[in-house]
Amino acid sequence: MSQQVIIFDTTLRDGEQALQASLSVKEKLQIALALERMGVDVMEVGFPVSSPGDFESVQTIARTIKNSRVCALARCVEKDIDVAAESLKVAEAFRIHTFIATSPMHIATKLRSTLDEVIERAIYMVKRARNYTDDVEFSCEDAGRTPIADLARVVEAAINAGATTINIPDTVGYTMPFEYANIISGLYDRVPNIDKAIISVHTHDDLGIAVGNALAAVHAGARQVEGAMNGIGERAGNCALEEVIMAIKVRKDIMNVHTNINHHEIWRTSQTVSQICNMPIPANKAIVGTGAFAHSSGIHQDGVLKNRENYEIMTPESIGLNQVQLNLTSRSGRAAVKHRMEEMGYQESDYNLDHLYDAFLKLADKKGQVFDYDLEALAFINKQQEEPEHFRLDYFNVQSGSSDIATASIKLVCGDEIKTEAANGNGPVDAIYQAINRVTDYNIELVKYGLSAKGHGKDALGQVDIVVDYNGRRFHGVGLATDIVESSAKAMVHVLNNIWRAAEVEKELQRKAQNKENNKETV
């Protein structure tokens, strides 16, 4: 009977560190719910001590998630562990993940300490974490460059202190697969109490072998793999979880292990992470790239037509990618739209049917037929923009030509006021952004502008993703329409609402902090 490999997702912690703009609490929760649907065993959702915002997002996710274990990161520092526990205590089940560096380089130059002191600190902090939960993970940072004898000493001590999972990370993506496998098997040979903990691996893709390293470690005995969806993360990224999951499934003949992942949710979860994080998936990306199941060679096409297994080691359907696209029209009713969403795997809680159907009718009137990919794009946008809006685009008009200066006029709803403005710009998009900036008086700098087609052909929806800098913080906005100028305007209005909401959250956090101080003074 095969053993289970625990899937530990760190998209919302290690993965988020690679993003140009921080995610809102709502966006993080959206990803967490997608990961829960996919069936991840553990999700690491933040570093609570780092900021009040991160604390709030961890707490919100911990309160909401019911079927996955929620985890938070903490250094081997008392305050880190205490704050992590405070943010997680509302969860059905939670884990505290604490870490300290173990390689000679990190100990000498970063910690300015000794191995004995590191071991002593690790023991104390694992025991402290165990006061809050019986599920404690301990990581030996830079384990890939730690001598095996030193590593074995740390691991044995951490297990004796109460760690239930021991993580052996290749922090800088330096280790080769055969070396990594030797580290794992070496620990099994050297650590007498290793049977009392689950051995985990966390790999980075600096040399392009994060997935290979993780699989080699599993083959050598590791029973937890840490990574992020689509491989997002610092530098070259983390181990791509969807690749590990499908490799274990497809090559079960030699891996002799399994995961409890619902692999039919992989495609949708991957798309959710890509869209919310504003990180497009390369067409040739394994498992989830648009070309992953494409065949252009005549020989390959002929072979696939005769038998798909000639050139496909897995099917698109196995990851939840439905290649049969059905279309709806403006004559399709709400029930038809709801039924199609259910067929694509969406639950009622994933979208607001009233808002989705209104957007569907507007799109159907414009382009006639609405396909599955249109519905998915509309559902995503409506989910992103379902929160109360302070700003709303009421009207816009743009005049532009090859020999004319682009001019835009807008009418923007700002709370209880309606404001109008006009401006010139270097093209229609710049003109409309200049007009919006005049209305709001926000000092916004556009950092990134991206346009992608959602669908096929000349009537495809155009999705605009932008990143702006406002007062030293990055914010992401997204807009969707058949007209790219309209998409661009909607993306900027989405950014304005995100900035406004962030300010409101900051005010609320300050209010709570002040109330806490007032209560202390009263006591």
From Swiss-Prot:
Role, per record: Catalyzes the condensation of the acetyl group of acetyl-CoA with 3-methyl-2-oxobutanoate (2-ketoisovalerate) to form 3-carboxy-3-hydroxy-4-methylpentanoate (2-isopropylmalate).
One protein family per Pfam: HCS_D2
Listed GO biological process terms: L-leucine biosynthetic process
Catalytic activity, reaction form: 3-methyl-2-oxobutanoate + acetyl-CoA + H2O = (2S)-2-isopropylmalate + CoA + H(+)
Location(s) in or outside the cell: Cytoplasm
E.C. number: 2.3.3.13
DNA-binding found in the keyword field: no
Origin species: Klebsiella pneumoniae subsp. pneumoniae (strain ATCC 700721 / MGH 78578)
HAMAP family from the UniProt entry: LeuA_type1
Record's subunit section: Homodimer.
Cofactor: Mn(2+)
Protein name, per record: 2-isopropylmalate synthase
